[in-house]
């Protein structure tokens, strides 16, 4: 009898730049004293039934009177909102508002309009966004590495894949992305 050796007709690679769908956005800033913004964006990759999280996290720089004066998290948050075509943001007091100045009490609820319904089991398909997925190196040697998504997310189309690759190359060259090699 002849040996059976199946041929691989396609490979599935869930690391690197991949199309994805946003299936949930949670505000976890209340869980951490140091985080003025902590948005956990849950992404479902095309062809996968498993989600990965991209986190937009950080604190504000503040003036002595308590007004927000800056912070790199603000730039990351507005870049993500631009990808969504979302006109929300923060005011000088660090409170969430829409473009008309209306207060947003629950930013996660507000952002839910930019997520897609998902049954928790079906593989992702027709992802509207591109994100970089990778296995993050553990912070301490010998600890577990986790599959994550980088917070830099682009629309899926045009030259966005090339732009995202340039951004990811920059983050890697500066040591902001540390991938597990083991």
Where are these regions (language model features)?
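Short beta-rich binding modules
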Residues: 1-182
